[in-house]
């Protein structure tokens, strides 16, 4: 398989998973034109579109792509039924697209119906986990998002986090503000600054790396807890997550 990221809008990524036999899967096409141009340039035919949630910057290109590729299957959660999804997926369901199997994982938080799609090693997680960060809570609660993170954290270390935005540098600046002496975060920030200076993407990232530099995956870390004002171990780790999200919202 060949993973292709297509920049869209200001900081979005639309993903293509190319089977290297002329066919591909499109993930979260917020706009159609860059997708259609890429399909033409690489001579690819889409087998399906998969949608993680209902926000416009993830679904806005569906209608135009389907208009060109008549009969195209569009997989997504119930909240995308009015955004072009014609195959509704549910938590725990496995879908198969041209021989490629994807596990559907419910990850409420950013939206209530948000799902992720996992086909080792690829995790298409929309606006749930970002590199060094997490999605805003537009509909769900911090506890829901914490539980979603815990579920995704059970995946293997080599999992490729294919998130939908280039937020890494701003997330790392926030992490440095919370834990200024953390060497993993400091080193990775320098690496990402170098990448971005050359116009290169910082994603996908790996779950192994995120365990080190993503504070939202480190709620058990006693140093982090102390920095957030938890002087005794919290009764519930989701309260650490909630405090982190609140601080990020106001950063």
UniProtKB/Swiss-Prot annotation:
Which is a Pfam family this sequence falls into? HAGH_C
Q: Which UniProt keywords apply?
A: Hydrolase, Metal-binding, Zinc
How would you classify this enzyme at the top EC level?
Answer: hydrolase
> Does the UniProt entry include the keyword Transport?
no
Q: Which SMART domains match?
A: Lactamase_B
Q: Please list every transmembrane segment annotated in the UniProt record, as residue ranges.
A: none
What highest taxon heads this organism's lineage?
Bacteria
What the record notes about the co-factor is: Binds 2 Zn(2+) ions per subunit.
**GO terms for molecular function, please?**
hydroxyacylglutathione hydrolase activity; metal ion binding
Q: Could you say which residues bind Zn(2+) 2 here?
A: 57-58, 127, 165
Protein function: Thiolesterase that catalyzes the hydrolysis of S-D-lactoyl-glutathione to form glutathione and D-lactic acid.
Assembly description:
Monomer.
- Name the protein family: Belongs to the metallo-beta-lactamase superfamily. Glyoxalase II family.
Query: Which protein, by its recorded name, is this?
Result: Hydroxyacylglutathione hydrolase
Supply the source organism for this entry: Serratia proteamaculans (strain 568)
Organism lineage string: Bacteria, Pseudomonadati, Pseudomonadota, Gammaproteobacteria, Enterobacterales
């Amino acid at each position: 398989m060949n993973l292709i990221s297509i920049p869209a809008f200001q900081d979005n990524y639309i993903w293509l998973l190319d089977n290297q036999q002329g066919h591909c899967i499109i993930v979260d096409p917020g706009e159609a034109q860059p997708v259609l141009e890429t399909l033409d340039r690489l001579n690819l035919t889409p087998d399906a579109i998969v949608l993680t949630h209902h926000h416009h910057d993830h679904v806005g290109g569906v209608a135009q792509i389907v208009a060109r590729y008549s009969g195209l299957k569009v997989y997504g959660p119930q909240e995308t039924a009015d955004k072009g999804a014609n195959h509704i997926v549910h938590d725990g369901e496995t879908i198969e697209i041209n021989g490629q199997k994807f596990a559907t994982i419910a990850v409420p938080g950013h939206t209530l119906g948000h799902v992720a799609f996992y086909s080792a090693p690829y995790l298409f997680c929309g606006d749930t986990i970002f590199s060094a960060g997490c999605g805003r809570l537009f509909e769900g609660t911090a506890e829901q998002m914490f539980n979603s993170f815990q579920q995704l954290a059970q995946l293997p270390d080599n999992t490729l986090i294919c998130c939908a935005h280039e937020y890494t540098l701003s997330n790392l600046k926030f992490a440095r503000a919370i834990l200024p002496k953390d060497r993993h975060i400091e080193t990775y920030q320098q690496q990402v600054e170098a990448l971005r200076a050359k116009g290169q993407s910082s994603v996908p990232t790996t779950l192994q790396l995120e365990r080190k530099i993503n504070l939202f995956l480190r709620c058990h870390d006693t140093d982090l807890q102390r920095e957030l004002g938890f002087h005794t171990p919290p009764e519930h780790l989701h309260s650490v997550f909630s405090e982190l999200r609140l601080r990020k919202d106001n950063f």
